[in-house]
Amino acid sequence: MILEHVLVLSAYLFLIGLYGLIMSRNMVRALMCLELILNAVNMNFVTFSDFFDNSQLKGDIFCIFVIAIAAAEAAIGLAIVSSIYRNRKSTRINQSTLLNK
């Protein structure tokens, strides 16, 4: 694939995720948008690693590291959302005022 096409696709994914993260009022949707942003960043890492230096796997290794961190972030985020839903019966961001007290 051509470098520009992959970068444009990655930019679209990043902007869709950023828009969803800013406009979302649901915690689960915000976590999904954050994962979309991280996947766009991973796409850039792999693309630049493949395009500029085929012999080294620095971009691919960093991409695997980001995937592992994103999996941990998703697990912890969903556990927090589950706990907030159990206590507040809502997953809306503006209704979770647990840290304000």
From Swiss-Prot:
GO cellular component, one term: chloroplast thylakoid membrane
Function: NDH shuttles electrons from NAD(P)H:plastoquinone, via FMN and iron-sulfur (Fe-S) centers, to quinones in the photosynthetic chain and possibly in a chloroplast respiratory chain. The immediate electron acceptor for the enzyme in this species is believed to be plastoquinone. Couples the redox reaction to proton translocation, and thus conserves the redox energy in a proton gradient.
Keywords for the protein's UniProt record, in alphabetical order: Chloroplast, Membrane, NAD, NADP, Plastid, Plastoquinone, Quinone, Thylakoid, Translocase, Transmembrane, Transmembrane helix, Transport
Pfam family, one: Oxidored_q2
Complex formation: NDH is composed of at least 16 different subunits, 5 of which are encoded in the nucleus.
Topological type in the membrane: Multi-pass membrane protein
The keyword Secreted appears for this protein: no
PANTHER family in the cross-refs: NADH-UBIQUINONE OXIDOREDUCTASE CHAIN 4L, NADH-UBIQUINONE OXIDOREDUCTASE SUBUNIT ND4L
Reactions that this protein is recorded to catalyse: a plastoquinone + NADH + (n+1) H(+)(in) = a plastoquinol + NAD(+) + n H(+)(out); a plastoquinone + NADPH + (n+1) H(+)(in) = a plastoquinol + NADP(+) + n H(+)(out)
Localization (cell): Plastid, Chloroplast thylakoid membrane
GO biological process, one term: ATP synthesis coupled electron transport
InterPro entries (UniProt xref): NADH_UbQ_OxRdtase_chain4L/K, NUOK/Mnh_C1-like
Family: Belongs to the complex I subunit 4L family.
Presence of keyword Cytoplasm: no
UniProt-recorded name of the protein: NAD(P)H-quinone oxidoreductase subunit 4L, chloroplastic
TM regions (residue ranges): 2-22, 32-52, 61-81
Domain of life of the organism encoding this protein: Eukaryota
Single Gene Ontology MF annotation: quinone binding
